[in-house]
Amino acid sequence: MEQQNHIYREIKTPSTVSLRVKGSKFIGYSFNITSKDDVKERIADLRKKEHKARHFCFAYILKNNKSIQIVNDDGEPSSTAGKPILRQILSKDLTNVLIVVVRYFGGIKLGVSGLINAYKSAANEVINKSGVITKYLQEYYQLNFKYTDINDVMRIIKKYNIEIIKSNLKLECIIIFAVSMKDSKHTIEIFEKNHGLIINKLEHGSIKKTL
């Protein structure tokens, strides 16, 4: 059974849905995001695209541990828009996602429960349309070895489909690779069985400084 702290879920593809509730038009948008700047950019683009809309309500979650969770009712009564959207994101166990529901007012007030249901439905539909993909958290390692060992190293990399991030293949070789957290222990054991190979775990932020 997969350990839950080794995986995270995102939407497969950005999508759009539309529904009408008592004359009001609700358009749901989903986006993959990696930063708060992404959110600002997507919202700004939508405000230009849907410039006649009255409300741009949204919720988003960032980080694989879901540590950043933000909601915005954009003028709707408190907790009638952003929170219902967020609850749909959480119900699908998603992260790194922005859901925006744009509302064109149709002249009829929907009331608190009506608004909650409308924003909930739009968010749920756009998430379902986007689909969900499960991803594995990765760890990064630096492998140091002599060029005479390159055939053995590359054989292991090919056999276990290991992702090479960077490499410097000279007399003294360096390869930086990524491996899913769930497979990291097994992968390290395989490399350590080969004498002369030196392997060290890297912090993700240090990769750019290496090589």
PLM feature spans:
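Structural motif
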Residues: Y29, F58, N96-I99, Y140
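C-terminal regulatory domains involved in ligand/effector binding and gene-expression control
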Residues: M1-T80, K166, K193-L211
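N-terminal positively charged helical leader segments and presequences
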Residues: L171-E172
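Terminal, non-globular segments
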Residues: F177-H186
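Active-site beta-strand/loop microenvironment that shapes enzyme catalytic pockets
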Residues: A81-N128
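Short amphipathic alpha-helix segments
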Residues: N144-I162
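Short glycine-/aliphatic-rich beta-strand segments at the starts of folded cytosolic domains
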Residues: V132-Y147
